[in-house]
């Protein structure tokens, strides 16, 4: 038989989804894959029930149902501080994952270089490679996960065409400051680089910090694509609804790839999601307060147990240091498998997020009901006995 594609020969299956499968097999509490165990807003579920009987159930307009795009334009326009045209500057996608892939194919040519920070969400490397591009990594330095502007400029100077930024950042929990984003923006403008933003955690930020949108920085709207989804903000990770926002000339290219890649998003889910997108502003305050509550439970529990970790500025992830529990020669992958099978808690090995040779970090998440978090902490409290 003829040779299969070489595009995916250098990456494996998703480590995150693998840990979910292992957690399911052994009945572990899944703190690996970042999805909640509580319901989305009741208003959205009630609307979905009605839509299930009334429709729509057929193909939508490829770019997304008009009322869905209009709701995104209103909601995002408020938070971004600009008017967004739903007819020319938005496309609905199958989660932010598809938005990122469509954007890469719309902007990049084979061999182009894409800068990303390390640690990074594992999908980014695979997506860049699938686009026949070269990933270039710039380290975020713990514990604050700051970056060296000179190192970043070296990466740009080497011929970068785009930079991918997750803000707030998965897995580090870093929230990029306005000053940091302006530093990146200056480099993007100077070296003519596109900014591809993954902003799915935009409303999960702690301790009075503020999410700054890259496309709101002067000179950046013209070269920025903002990718996001409803998965986190409305607790509907299984609905797979996302979107991209970009200037008209870029959006026209993204829509072409979306059209032939996905045809469209699920019609009934877009209809039900409009209710969520039209929630009053108080919803986002209550949503943020709920996540601050879950974070407090989990981080206080981790401190009481004595597991070292990095306190996140945003997102619902914690990077924990497993150095005290690693056996000699044990990999972080094996540790996580044993943690799921013996301690009953699912985690993700940190090596799947870092370009650097990391073996002592795991990622845990706390988007769970109180009782789930307390049960997970109780199991982690016996980690020394069970490993």
Spans of features found by a protein language model:
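A short helix->loop->beta-strand "cap" motif at the edges of active sites that frequently abuts
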Residues: 112, 133, 190-194, 221-222
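Active-site phosphate-binding strand-loop segment of PLP-dependent enzymes
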Residues: 140-207
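PLP-dependent enzyme catalytic core of the Aspartate aminotransferase-like
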Residues: 74, 154, 328-330, 338-347, ...
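PLP-dependent aminotransferase class I/II
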Residues: 223-314
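PLP-dependent aminotransferase-like
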Residues: 86, 106-165, 178
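Conserved PLP-binding catalytic core of the aspartate aminotransferase-like
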Residues: 291-292, 305-342
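N-terminal small-domain helix-loop-helix segment of the aminotransferase-like
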Residues: 2-95, 102, 278-279, 386-387
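Helix C-cap/helix->beta junction micro-motif
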Residues: 26, 131, 190-191, 305, ...
């Amino acid at each position: 038989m003829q040779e299969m594609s070489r595009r995916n020969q250098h990456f494996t299956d998703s480590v995150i989804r693998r840990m979910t499968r292992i957690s399911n097999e052994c009945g572990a509490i899944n703190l690996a894959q970042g999805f909640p165990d509580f319901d989305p807003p009741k208003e959205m579920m009630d609307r979905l029930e009605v839509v299930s009987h009334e429709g729509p159930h057929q193909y939508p307009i490829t770019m997304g149902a008009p009322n869905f795009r209009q709701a995104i334009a209103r909601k995002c326009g408020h938070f971004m501080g600009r008017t967004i045209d739903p007819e020319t500057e938005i496309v609905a996608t199958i989660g932010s994952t598809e938005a990122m892939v469509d954007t890469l194919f719309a902007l990049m040519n084979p061999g182009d270089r894409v800068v990303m920070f390390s640690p990074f969400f594992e999908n980014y490397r695979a997506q860049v490679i699938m686009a026949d591009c070269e990933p270039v990594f710039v380290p975020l330095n713990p514990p604050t996960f700051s970056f060296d502007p000179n190192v970043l400029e070296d990466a740009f100077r080497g011929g970068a065409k785009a930079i991918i930024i997750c803000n707030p950042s998965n897995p580090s929990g870093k929230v990029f400051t306005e000053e940091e984003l302006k530093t990146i923006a200056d480099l993007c403008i100077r070296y003519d680089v596109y900014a591809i933003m993954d902003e799915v955690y935009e409303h999960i930020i702690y301790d009075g910090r503020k999410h700054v949108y890259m496309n709101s920085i002067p000179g950046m709207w013209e070269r920025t694509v903002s990718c996001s989804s409803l998965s986190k903000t409305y607790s509907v990770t299984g609905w797979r609804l996302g979107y991209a926002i970009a200037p008209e000339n870029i959006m026209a290219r993204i829509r072409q790839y979306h059209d032939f890649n996905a045809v469209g998003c699920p019609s009934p889910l877009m209809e039900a999601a409009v209710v969520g997108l039209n929630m009053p502003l108080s919803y986002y305050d209550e949503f943020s307060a709920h996540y601050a509550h879950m974070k407090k439970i989990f981080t206080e529990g981790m401190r009481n147990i004595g597991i070292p970790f990095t306190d996140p500025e945003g997102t619902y992830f914690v990077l924990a240091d497993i150095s005290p529990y690693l056996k000699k020669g044990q990999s972080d992958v094996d540790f996580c498998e044993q943690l799921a099978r013996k301690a009953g808690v699912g985690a993700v090995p940190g090596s799947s997020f870092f370009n650097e040779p990391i073996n002592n970090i795991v990622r845990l998440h706390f988007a769970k009901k109180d009782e789930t978090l307390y049960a997970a902490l109780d199991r982690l409290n016996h980690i020394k006995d069970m490993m």
